[in-house]
Amino acid sequence: MSGKTVTRADLAESVFRKVGLSRTESAELVETVIDEICNAIVRGESVKLSSFATFQVRDKNERIGRNPKTGEEVPISPRRVMTFKASNVLKQRVLKAHLSRKSKLKPSNPAG
């Protein structure tokens, strides 16, 4: 893992370089896209970005949990949670990149 975190500013910079919008317009575009995704999720809609992922909101019912320290049963309130499900295309890209890095790190074993 590289440890790098991609930020909104990084996305805006990429739009600036690849699309040719001004830096301000690029930042506004990134903000607009993120706002639209967030608004749809808040409304309870699924957001499906083909070849990337699906974001969904799920309602979870009340259930009984357990305090790991004491073993005491504790009710867990009903709540809404957001899920992220990567597409198969994205999963394959991640796997391919992982295998490629792994093969580069493996030392060659010369016969002899």
Swiss-Prot record:
Query: Which CDD domains does the record associate with it?
Result: IHF_A (cd13835)
- List the Pfam families: Bac_DNA_binding
Keywords on record: DNA recombination, DNA-binding, Transcription, Transcription regulation, Translation regulation
Domain of life, per lineage: Bacteria
InterPro entries, A to Z: Hist_DNA-bd, Histone-like_DNA-bd_CS, IHF-like_DNA-bd_dom_sf, IHF_alpha
Q: Which one of the record's GO molecular function terms can you name?
A: structural constituent of chromatin
GO CC terms for this protein?
cytosol
Note the HAMAP family from the entry.
Answer: IHF_alpha
**Its biological purpose:** This protein is one of the two subunits of integration host factor, a specific DNA-binding protein that functions in genetic recombination as well as in transcriptional and translational control.
Q: What is this protein called?
A: Integration host factor subunit alpha
According to its UniProt entry, this protein's organism is Rhizobium meliloti (strain 1021)
Organism lineage string: Bacteria, Pseudomonadati, Pseudomonadota, Alphaproteobacteria, Hyphomicrobiales
Gene name of this polypeptide:
ihfA
